[in-house]
Design a protein with these regions (language model features):
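A conserved acidic beta->alpha catalytic loop
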Residues: 40-50, 68
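Short loop->beta transition adjacent to catalytic acidic/histidine clusters or analogous donor-positioning motifs
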Residues: 4-6, 27-38, 59-62
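Short aromatic/hydrophobic "clamp" motif used to bind/position activated sugar donors
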Residues: 88
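Conserved donor NDP-sugar-binding/catalytic core segment of glycosyltransferases
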Residues: 100-132
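Conserved nucleotide-sugar donor-binding catalytic segment
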Residues: 142-223
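Glycine-rich, basic loop-to-helix element that forms the pyrophosphate-binding segment
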Residues: 66-83
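The conserved acidic donor/metal-binding loop of glycosyltransferases
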Residues: 92-96
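Short, well-formed alpha-helical segments that are part of the catalytic scaffolds
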Residues: 15-28
Length: 365
């Protein structure tokens, strides 16, 4: 087998219906030097049985049955830590990739040795259709991580990750209040990687994402406000830990601290008033509105346009100073409890001073 070994992590739970199609897609990849690591969560015997034909017929496939529930983040992180390859790819159990997907990404990774991730276009279909090309991250580490903060785009998460960069990250952290979901942990992970290398979009290969209505991110849209608030605050604290450390001076770190808080506390979506009418239109079955629905679907599939009108997407949006104060309080509580961020070492400040200044800027202003 020519070329570096690539580990493909396939975490799965109750995915027996779609899993064989995905595994066959991996088995027939044009790039053959693969280590396909299937991690079956919570002793799910039915999903494990769906893997057996591949385990018997191809030595590149191996499987671990987890005795207890890890959740998607914990299960995915396990495959990252148990990788054998020089590169790693996360593969959702119910998605597929183009036949030369791995080969194309490996070729790009060898061509761009400074890239932490080489990733492909993501084509979503099902409940909605969209083409996502993500946001390439180039330049110096600060420029890359601030661009990552600005857009918070996760398309690159499905790309080819360089093992040497992956080894220098914290992996996928678990939130203590909802470890089976751990909203935003992949975004924190991507920000860590953005400090370690470039994100390169590779033309040609395609990741096919299936939106069947039960996807995790669709379920999050139905969360109650208090859960969205807590998850958003947790992610903000995680991002502070990663982004602020990239500053090259105390002044730059203070500026980056403010930029993170601004990104999470201050809504900036001039097109918000269109959301509810567009959603009602999408649910309508009126024949007279069909041409408009076709136009809306086309607009939603236009990645640059979608990005331009929804650049600052937020899981939880504050609408008044009291909500911002409450969100800010949770962010600081999370930072203190985690113990990974030291305001004295990073910003030559105290928790009390930081909170006072943050409230003055984002609550009292």
């Amino acid at each position: 087998m020519n070329g570096p070994l690539v580990t493909i992590g396939v975490p799965v739970y109750q995915g027996q219906d779609d899993l064989p199609t995905t595994l066959e897609c991996l088995r027939t990849q044009s790039y053959s030097n693969l280590d396909v690591l299937i991690s079956v969560d919570a002793a799910d015997r039915t999903s494990a049985q769906a893997c057996e034909p591949f385990l018997r017929g191809d030595p590149r496939f191996r499987m671990q049955i987890q005795p207890s529930r890890l959740g998607w983040a914990g299960n995915t992180d396990w495959t990252m830590r148990e990788r054998r390859g020089a590169f790693y790819i996360f593969q959702q159990h119910d998605d597929q990739v183009s036949p030369t997907y791995v080969a194309d990404l490996v070729e790009a990774a060898l061509r761009y040795p400074d890239a932490a991730i080489c990733y492909a276009e993501v084509q979503s279909s099902g409940v909605t259709s969209q083409i996502m090309r993500g946001v390439p991250l180039l330049g110096d580490p600060v420029e890359r991580v601030l661009t990552c903060l600005r857009f918070m785009d996760h398309a690159a998460f499905r790309g080819l990750i360089r093992g040497t960069a992956l080894a220098r990250t914290s992996g996928l952290l678990l939130s203590d209040f909802d470890p089976f979901d751990s909203y935003g942990t992949e975004m924190r992970f991507l920000m860590e990687l953005s400090l370690l290398g470039e994100f390169r979009l590779v033309p040609g290969p395609i990741y096919y994402k299936r939106l069947h209505g039960a996807n995790l991110y669709l379920k999050r849209e139905k969360w109650p406000a208090h859960k969205k608030q807590l998850a958003w605050a947790c992610l903000c604290a995680w991002v502070v830990e990663v982004v602020v450390s990239a500053g090259r001076s105390q002044a730059e770190r203070l500026r980056m601290f403010d930029m993170v808080l601004d990104r999470f506390l201050v809504p900036n979506n001039p097109w918000k008033w269109l959301r509810d009418p567009v959603r009602r239109l999408a649910r309508s079955r009126s024949r007279a509105l069909h041409p408009i629905r076709v136009l809306v679907d086309w607009l939603k599939s236009n990645d640059p346009l979608v990005r331009s009108v929804s650049e600052r997407w937020m899981l939880y949006e504050t609408t008044d100073p009291k909500q911002r104060e409450a969100l800010l309080r949770i962010v600081f509580d999370r930072l203190k409890a985690a113990g990974r961020f030291d305001p004295a070492a990073s910003l030559n400040s105290t928790w009390e001073t930081l909170e006072e200044e943050a409230n003055r800027r984002f609550v009292e202003a």
